[in-house]
């Protein structure tokens, strides 16, 4: 693979002082962000994938890099296997008296907290703020008098109701709640499915920024009150309007050192997941106005706009995607399909070594733990890998997988000393995986490429060299997973219930079509 042909996949910074939305065409769902000095930090939900809760950094709100994860592994054995749609939901990040705090809801376990004084370094092990089922989307807040609070929403799938917000007084060090708290807002009548609350204070008002109306079609609501327990005035401040951006909501109000205001939020585009946008924001009569073309204080998203004024120009950059496995650690673009184990892989001499893990042959590929995955980086692309197969053992299956609701994989299987090609397709909601043989494979090296067109159509190509790739198998349409977009990656398993061999990958490279 010629590295000079590798380019960044999605560039929002136009190089002329403007940016285009989305700023990240990648599934960083449920974003929250803060500014500390001249640095911006953003986090996102990651459900059952590990490491969990990605942490991104930027100097200008447009160019972002993943710098860390808040949790290395999920703290419950339940997540040793994939539990689609469970795990870490919408988190919140805050900075208080020299410490960074991240609140993480796990709807089946409770509200967890991790903290650090160095966001690039190690975060504390997760600790309970409250052990409770069905509470989601927590956000901490410290008032001027030193008292601390946590606002939360509710998951109807776990607790039987939604569209309500709740306020709990908490210990200032976030080690627990002080009392049972109380309901503070009922959105059933005017703000259905209100959730994802973020709590701020400005000019004597408490503000709750919260999405409502549902993930795909919803809008951004803001509540305000002079009392942290309400009653609350309400206003819709951002909606789709005449823009092509559906459901512009759930995110973070941030400012620049010179006082500009901005709003980060997601847009659910289906197969690519919930991608990230940046909107200008200003204040009128102590209400935020987000976006442009505001009518009665409700704006709509921008597609192109002047970059934030942060006092300096910073290089154009994007999160990592392609990987040549040249370091001694996995790139931060990678996550596993469940709680990972170090023995699943090695990095050596510029290769990723995947050790085939024992797997029940009846288990669907989407439910295999040791799938090494990363998010889609653009709406259309090809992804290519080169795998060395000479150390495979009988029963081993290895290849390139594209996950999602409907998933597909192109793999090499070794049985009785002979290798053959196989395509696997299925749906995570059904037990109906189809395994289609595609003929013998007589080389110890395989190049596998998958093309994704129109954010939907996935087609595989294989060859013994990068130059002789030929189409193989069936095109499989992508569908999103449970609250997540499609992820692509590599895997190696052994379906004879034994310790398998290994497969060596030279690279995993994304390119524009």
Task: Report the location of each language-model feature.
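Carbohydrate-active catalytic/glycan-binding domains of CAZyme proteins
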Residues: 1-513
């Amino acid at each position: 693979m010629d590295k000079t042909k590798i380019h960044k996949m999605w560039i929002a910074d136009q190089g002329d002082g403007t940016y285009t939305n989305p700023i990240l065409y990648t599934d960083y769902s449920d974003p929250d962000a803060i500014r500390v000095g001249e640095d911006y930090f953003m986090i996102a939900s990651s459900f059952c994938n590990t490491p969990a809760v990605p942490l991104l950094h930027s100097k200008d709100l447009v160019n972002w890099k993943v710098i860390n994860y808040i949790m290395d592994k999920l703290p419950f054995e339940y997540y040793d296997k994939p539990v689609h749609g469970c795990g870490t939901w919408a988190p919140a990040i805050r900075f208080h008296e020299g410490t960074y705090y991240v609140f993480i809801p796990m709807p089946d376990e409770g509200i967890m907290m991790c903290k650090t004084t160095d966001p690039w370094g190690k975060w504390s092990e997760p600790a309970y703020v409250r052990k409770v089922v069905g509470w989601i989307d927590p956000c901490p807040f410290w008032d001027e008098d030193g008292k601390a609070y946590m606002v939360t929403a509710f998951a109807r799938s776990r607790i039987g109701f939604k569209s309500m917000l709740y306020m709990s007084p908490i210990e200032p060090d976030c080690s627990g709640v002080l009392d049972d708290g109380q309901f503070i807002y009922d959105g059933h009548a005017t703000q259905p499915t209100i959730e994802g609350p973020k709590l701020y204070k400005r000019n004597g008002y408490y503000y709750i920024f919260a999405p409502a109306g549902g993930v795909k079609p919803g809008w951004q609501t803001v509540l305000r009150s002079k009392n942290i327990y309400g009653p609350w005035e309400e206003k819709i401040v951002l909606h789709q309007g005449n823009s092509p951006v559906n459901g512009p909501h759930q995110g973070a109000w941030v400012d620049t050192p010179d006082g500009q205001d901005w709003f980060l939020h997601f847009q659910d585009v289906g197969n690519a997941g919930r991608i990230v946008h940046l909107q200008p924001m200003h204040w009128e009569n102590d209400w935020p106005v987000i976006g442009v073309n505001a009518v009665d204080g409700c704006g709509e998203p921008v597609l192109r706009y002047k970059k934030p004024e942060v006092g300096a120009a910073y290089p154009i950059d994007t999160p990592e995607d392609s990987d040549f496995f040249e370091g001694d650690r996995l790139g931060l673009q990678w996550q596993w399909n469940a709680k990972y184990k170090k023995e699943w892989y090695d990095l050596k001499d510029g290769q990723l070594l995947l050790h085939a893990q024992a797997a029940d042959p009846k288990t669907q590929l989407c439910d295999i733990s040791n799938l090494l995955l990363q998010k889609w980086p653009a709406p259309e692309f090809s992804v290519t890998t080169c795998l060395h197969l000479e150390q495979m053992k009988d029963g081993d299956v290895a290849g390139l997988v594209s996950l999602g609701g409907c998933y597909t994989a192109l793999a090499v299987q070794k049985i009785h000393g002979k290798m053959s090609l196989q395509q696997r397709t299925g749906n995570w909601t059904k037990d109906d995986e189809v395994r289609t043989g595609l003929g013998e494979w007589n080389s110890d090296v395989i190049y596998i490429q998958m093309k994704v067109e129109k954010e939907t159509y996935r087609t595989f190509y294989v060859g013994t060299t990068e130059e002789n790739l030929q189409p193989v198998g069936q095109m499989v349409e992508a569908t999103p997973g449970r609250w997540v977009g499609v992820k692509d990656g590599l895997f190696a398993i052994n379906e004879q219930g034994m310790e398998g061999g290994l497969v060596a990958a030279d690279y995993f490279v994304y390119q524009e079509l």
